[in-house]
Curated annotation (Swiss-Prot):
Protein name per Swiss-Prot or TrEMBL: Divalent metal cation transporter MntH
Superkingdom of origin: Bacteria
UniProt function note: H(+)-stimulated, divalent metal cation uptake system. Involved in manganese and iron uptake. Can also transport cadmium, cobalt, zinc and to a lesser extent nickel and copper. Involved in response to reactive oxygen.
InterPro entries (UniProt xref): NRAMP_fam
Outcome (variant: G36P): Loss of function
GO molecular function: cadmium ion transmembrane transporter activity; manganese ion transmembrane transporter activity; metal ion binding; proton transmembrane transporter activity; symporter activity
Lineage: Bacteria, Pseudomonadati, Pseudomonadota, Gammaproteobacteria, Enterobacterales
Coiled-coil ranges from the UniProt annotation: none
C-alpha cells in the first residue's frame, strides 16, 4: 500500500511538472494558422474539394518534427537558434542572417496584421483602415502581458488557438462535409491537375514558418524543473498537442471550403472577403460571423507571435534589445502604408508568403546541423533516422518553395 502511494504521488508530481512545462508550443502553433493559411486552405478546398487534405496531414507531420527540433535545441544548449548561429558563423554571415530574418518577420507580420484587420472589417462593418487601428490596439494590449512573464502570454495565445479550433468545429457542423470523402482525402494522395500541384506546394510551402523556428528555441531555452530528458519529454507532448490542434484547424478550413464552396459550384472563391460574403447565403449569417471571428483571433495571436519572434532574432543575432512597443509600432507601419495606398490586401498576403519562402532553408539547415552535433546536444542529439528525415524535409520544402517562387514570377 505504501509503495502504491509513493508511485501514485510520483506519478502526480510527474504530470504536474509536465503541465507546468507546457505552453511554448501553443505560441509556436499559432504561426501555422495565420491568415496566410486561411487564404491558401480556402482556395485549395474551393478549387479541389477534399482532394488536397492529405497535403495538410503530411505538412503538419513535417512541421511537428521541425518544432520538436527547435524546442530541443533550446532545452539542450540553453541558447536559441539565432544565438547558436551568432556563436558559430562568421560575423558577415550573422549580419546577413539577422537582416533576412527581420525582413521575413516583417513580411509575415504584414500578412497577419492585415488578416486581422480584414476580420474586423468583415464582422464590424468598419473600413480596412479602422480594422487596422483596432488590430494595433488589440495587439498592444496582448503584448502588455509579457511584462508579467511568459506564462500569462502562453495562456492568452493558447486560448486564442483553442477559440479558432472551436470556431472551426462550429463551421464543420454548419457545412456538413461528407465524412467518407473527407477521410479519403486525408489518406489517399491525389493531384488531379497542374493547378492542384501548385496549390499543394502552396499549402506545404506556407506551413513551415522560419520566424516560429527561431522563436520556439527561445521559448524553451529558459525552461526549468526536472532533468533535461524530462523537459524534453514534456516538450514532445506540448508540441504533439498544440500542433495536432493547429493541424485540425487547417484540415477544417479546407474541408469547410470544400463542403460550402466546391460542391455548390463556387470553385473560384480565392480571397477572405469573398469567402465571408459567399458563406452568408450558402450556410448562414452565423457561419460567416464565426469565420470572421476566427480570422480576427488567428490574425491577432499570430501578429503578436511575429512581434515576439522579431525580438528574439534581434537579441540573438546582434545582442540588441528594443522595447516590444517600439517594435510593434515600427512593424505596423508597412500594413498601414499598404492600406492607405489602396493595394489589394489578398495579393499582398500572397506576396508575403512568397517572400517568406526565402528564409525557410536558412533556418532549417543550421537547425539540423546544430541538433545533429553531439558536442552541443549531448544525449539529446538527433538519431540517424531523425537526421535523414530532417534532410528529406529540407530538400522537399526548399524545392517546393523554389518552384512556387518561379511559378509566381512567371505568373503560372
Amino acid at each position: 500500500m505504501t509503495n502504491y502511494r509513493v508511485e501514485s504521488s510520483s506519478g502526480r508530481a510527474a504530470r504536474k511538472m509536465r503541465l507546468a512545462l507546457m505552453g511554448p508550443a501553443f505560441i509556436a502553433a499559432i504561426g501555422y494558422i495565420d491568415p496566410g493559411n486561411f487564404a491558401t486552405n480556402i482556395q485549395a478546398g474551393a478549387s479541389f474539394g477534399y482532394q488536397l487534405l492529405w497535403v495538410v496531414v503530411w505538412a503538419n507531420l513535417m512541421a511537428m518534427l521541425i518544432q520538436i527540433l527547435s524546442a530541443k535545441l533550446g532545452i539542450a544548449t540553453g541558447k536559441n537558434l539565432a544565438e547558436q548561429i551568432r556563436d558559430h558563423y562568421p560575423r558577415p554571415v550573422v549580419w546577413f542572417y539577422w537582416v533576412q530574418a527581420e525582413i521575413i518577420a516583417m513580411a509575415t507580420d504584414l500578412a497577419e496584421f492585415i488578416g486581422a484587420a480584414i476580420g474586423f472589417k468583415l464582422i464590424l462593418g468598419v473600413s480596412l483602415l479602422q480594422g487596422a487601428v483596432l488590430t494595433g490596439i488589440a495587439t498592444f494590449l496582448i503584448l502588455m502581458l509579457q511584462r508579467r512573464g511568459q506564462k500569462p502570454l502562453e495562456k492568452v495565445i493558447g486560448g486564442l488557438l483553442l477559440f479558432v479550433a472551436a470556431a472551426y468545429i462550429v463551421e464543420l457542423i454548419f457545412s456538413q462535409p461528407n465524412l467518407a470523402q473527407l477521410g479519403k482525402g486525408m489518406v489517399i494522395p491525389s493531384l488531379p491537375t497542374s493547378e492542384a500541384v501548385f496549390l499543394a506546394a502552396g499549402v506545404l510551402g506556407a506551413t513551415i514558418m522560419p520566424h516560429v523556428i527561431y522563436l520556439h528555441s527561445s521559448l524553451t531555452q529558459h525552461l526549468h524543473g526536472g532533468s533535461r530528458q524530462q523537459r524534453y519529454s514534456a516538450t514532445k507532448w506540448d508540441v504533439a498537442i498544440a500542433m495536432t490542434i493547429a493541424g485540425f484547424v487547417n484540415l477544417a478550413m479546407m474541408a469547410t471550403a470544400a463542403a460550402a464552396f466546391h460542391f455548390s459550384g463556387h470553385t473560384g472563391v480565392a480571397d477572405l472577403d469573398e469567402a465571408y460574403l459567399t458563406l452568408q447565403p450558402l450556410l448562414s449569417h452565423a457561419a460567416a460571423t464565426v469565420f470572421g471571428l476566427s480570422l480576427v483571433a488567428a490574425g491577432l495571436s499570430s501578429t503578436v507571435v511575429g512581434t515576439l519572434a522579431g525580438q528574439v532574432v534581434m537579441q540573438g543575432f546582434i545582442r540588441f534589445h528594443i522595447p516590444l512597443w517600439v517594435r510593434r509600432t515600427v512593424t505596423m507601419l508597412p500594413s498601414f502604408i499598404v492600406i492607405l495606398m489602396g493595394l489589394d490586401p489578398t495579393r499582398i498576403l500572397v506576396m508575403s508568403q512568397v517572400l517568406l519562402s526565402f528564409g525557410i532553408a536558412l533556418a532549417l539547415v543550421p537547425l539540423l546541423i546544430f541538433t545533429s552535433d553531439s558536442k552541443l546536444m549531448g544525449d539529446l542529439v538527433n538519431s540517424k533516422r531523425v537526421k535523414q528525415t530532417g534532410w528529406v524535409i529540407v530538400v522537399l520544402v526548399v524545392a517546393l518553395n523554389i518552384w512556387l517562387l518561379v511559378g509566381t514570377a512567371l505568373g503560372l
